Amino acid sequence: MPPGARYSRHEAFSSASLSTAVSELSVETREVGDVTLLYPRGFINAHTVRRFEGEIQKALEQKRFKLVVNCEGLTYIASAGLGAIMGAIEEIRGNGGDLRLAALNETVRNIFEILGFHHLYRIFPSEVDAIRSFRDAPAAS
């Protein structure tokens, strides 16, 4: 763990069935300098999106406007998850920050490409590349 990094772990489960894989999501967060990293694991859908939104909102309440969503553990993202990202981006970019995506698997990457989200958000092959991008270039506007 890098110096100064902080972790938190939260889990959300659908009330319909804890055993249904599509209803499970955990979100870990970590801070590296002025960048907040989010690690969603599982599925972001209508049953789990509040946990994901809550972690984004916590970062914004702490005036942390540089976010990287590491999608390595994300199995699937439904429209509710995409809406959570879209819902936060105006505030993030309005405060000089950005939300960047890293380590997308093929399924998640295809969803973003089909919907044209790869034109709206910077996508990086690794978390390290996404973090570095905040130092190398200004935030999107």
Task: Please provide the spans of the model-predicted regions.
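Conserved catalytic submotifs in the C-terminal HATPase_c
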Residues: 32-34, 72, 104, 128
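Short leucine-rich amphipathic alpha-helices used at interfaces
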Residues: 26-27, 107, 135
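Amphipathic alpha-helical interaction surfaces in cytosolic regulatory modules
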Residues: 43-121
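Short beta-strand/loop segment at the start of cytosolic alpha/beta domains
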Residues: 2-39
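Residue-level signal for pocket-adjacent positions within structured domains
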Residues: 20, 39, 72, 119, ...
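A charged, well-structured terminal subsegment
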Residues: 123-141
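General small-molecule cofactor/ligand-binding pocket signal
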Residues: 30, 102, 124
